[in-house]
Design a protein with these regions (language model features):
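Conserved ABC ATPase signature
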Residues: 156-160, 435-439
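Hydrophobic anchor residue at the start of the ABC signature
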Residues: 170, 449
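Catalytic Walker B motif of ABC-type/P-loop ATPase nucleotide-binding domains
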Residues: 181-185, 460-464
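ABC ATPase nucleotide-binding domain signature region
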Residues: 50-127, 342-405
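H-loop (His-switch) and adjacent beta-strand-loop-beta switch element
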Residues: 227-242, 505-521
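H-loop/switch region of ABC-family ATPase nucleotide-binding domains
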Residues: 216-217, 495-496
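Conserved ABC ATPase "signature" region
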Residues: 123, 135-152, 398, 413-431
Length: 526
């Protein structure tokens, strides 16, 4: 490849999303010796920009010139699908929704033994256009080895963790040997080891002819071989240029609107903003009722095992969460963290075949599911996927009083006051009246936290709560979690990031391949 010639040029584009214009008259050029990272706050337009590159959103004006295209074409046309690989949370969400629909069809047709495997998903991009060739099989083996995902090829896609599905989709994009690979938040949902492995894989990919665009929220995830950085703010291209010129404390502070310190390390960058004292929450404003009736033991699991055929997801788990304790669960992808959450929430039916006690009642003993859920607030990627109804963010928050997907009754004046209180605490008033489905991933996460808390739950489950959040919203949500830690609500906090464990956490459980490595008081485990 001839170095330093144009690879892709965004010429004065403007994008219309619903009734708003974004990226007005934006110009951006990628040259053939460059790899770019894109940074910006939640809802700033990062994903809109990269979606425009493959035709995911239409252009209002301007054009995109695909200098890398393998065939001559008109500038306004999109290259062949094989030439651009794209991975994002929205793509992952679409895949899981499609698989859930397929599972319903199989159950209706009595074909419950059929599954969609990770291998099927990886090859699906090719099968959409043509049959598989020996060259495809050879490339498949190389990609799978490159990403280290041999172990999950025959697993059902529905049984994989968020991080495992993400790696499967990256393999799906790579098997087509694209000229341009767009990775929108590829590290979200991955454990520490998987993040390091994927970063190494992306760095190796950058040594070949393929160019990479990496959209990230965490500066630590900008891999070493990135050469240039584009900053996006409030729907506009804010700053762009060589990595070392753009990534300074001053520029990043201007991007996010508060003082940040950027430090260079041998692995890239680290950003810090100092510690903050968390205020106390006025429970008289945002709590609907007293939590005096909470039993001594909130959760208890005895010899709990979850198994799919020969795959053991949880292996004889013994664990309890008592009154006054706030727990964090750590573990690698596929270790069983999310399975524990699903057992508690009633989303995994194997809970009824095990000794799982919630608030003093054993699952399967005649308890009413909605009565149990009334005591639990939850924030997770799975819950975020379920909210597909077109409704305002305010109504999504209000639906938390009724544990419903959708709002089917009018809230009382007292309930409205509580909703308004959480909106004020989370500082989400600017998005609370917007259509929920039009919000960015990170903005939706903030709405779901408010939804989880409005019913004053004795237990709040947070499965990767910082997933998809920029540094400003991560700081805000961690501060709010610390504040919640000082209320009657107890926390079950699931994360892949040890550095995001709040100070209010009192106990930690570490999992590996479905087994408990250690559990106990935080100071003894970490």
């Amino acid at each position: 490849m001839e170095t330093n010639k144009p690879f892709l040029t965004v010429e004065n584009i403007t994008v219309r999303l619903r009734d708003q214009l974004f990226l007005k008259n934006s110009f951006w050029q990628i040259r053939s010796d460059q790899h770019w990272a894109i940074l910006g706050p939640n809802g700033s337009g990062k994903s809109t920009l990269v979606r425009s590159l493959w035709g995911g959103v239409p252009l209002q004006s301007g054009r995109i010139v695909y200098d890398f295209a393998s065939h001559q074409m008109e500038p306004q046309l999109i290259p062949q699908k094989d030439e651009i690989g794209y991975v994002s949370f929205e793509l992952q969400q679409s895949l899981m929704e499609h698989e859930a629909f397929q599972e319903d069809l199989r159950e209706y047709a009595g074909r419950t033994e059929e599954v969609t495997t990770a291998r099927d998903v990886i090859f699906s991009g090719i099968l959409a256009n043509r049959t598989i060739t020996p060259a495809d099989e050879e490339r498949f083996l190389k990609v799978v080895d490159h990403l280290g995902i041999q172990y999950l090829l025959q697993k059902s896609i529905g049984s994989l963790s968020t991080g495992e599905v993400r790696k499967t989709l990256i393999a799906r994009a790579l098997i087509k040997s694209p000229r341009l690979l767009i990775l929108d938040e590829p590290f979200d949902g991955l454990d520490e080891r998987s993040r390091a492995t994927l970063a190494e894989s992306i760095n190796r990919l950058m040594t070949g002819p393929m160019r990479v665009i990496l959209v990230v929220h965490r500066l630590e995830e900008i891999v070493l071989n990135i050469t240039h950085v584009l900053l996006v703010k409030e729907g506009q291209l804010f700053m762009q240029g060589p990595k070392d010129e753009i990534l300074t404390s001053e520029n990043i502070s201007r991007l996010y609107g508060f003082n940040l310190h950027l430090e260079r390390t041998n692995r890239g960058f680290r950003v810090s903003y100092g510690s903050e004292k968390s205020d106390k929450i006025d429970t008289s404003v945002v709590y609907e009722e007293s939590l005096q009736d909470v039993p001594e033991v909130l959760i208890e699991m005895k010899d709990t095992t979850v198994q799919y055929d020969d795959l053991i997801v949880l292996d004889r788990l013994n664990w309890s969460m008592r009154r006054g304790e706030n727990w964090a669960i750590l573990g690698t992808n596929g270790s069983g963290k999310s399975t524990i959450v699903k057992l508690i929430l009633g989303d995994n039916l194997q809970g009824y075949a095990n000794q799982v006690m919630l608030f003093g009642k054993r699952k399967g003993s005649g308890e009413i599911l909605w009565e149990i859920k009334r005591h639990i607030g939850a924030v997770s990627s799975e819950l975020q996927v379920q909210h597909r109804k077109k409704m305002s963010a305010y109504d999504v928050i209000t639906s938390g009083f009724y544990d419903s997907i959708g709002l089917y009754r009018y809230p009382t004046p007292k309930q409205k006051k509580i909703v308004d209180g959480w909106i004020e605490l989370l500082k989400i008033g600017d998005i609370s009246n917007q259509p929920y489905h039009q919000l960015s991933y990170g903005q939706k996460r903030m709405i779901l936290l408010a939804r989880a808390m409005v019913k004053s739950p004795p237990l709040l489950i947070m499965d990767e709560p910082c997933h998809g959040l920029d540094i400003s919203n991560r700081r805000r949500i961690l501060r709010i979690i610390e504040m919640i830690g000082g209320t009657p609500t107890q926390l079950l906090y699931v994360t892949n990031h040890r550095d995001e464990i709040p100070n209010c956490i009192t106990h930690v459980m570490r999992l590996h391949k479905g087994k408990v490595l250690s559990q106990g008081r935080k100071e003894d485990i970490l």
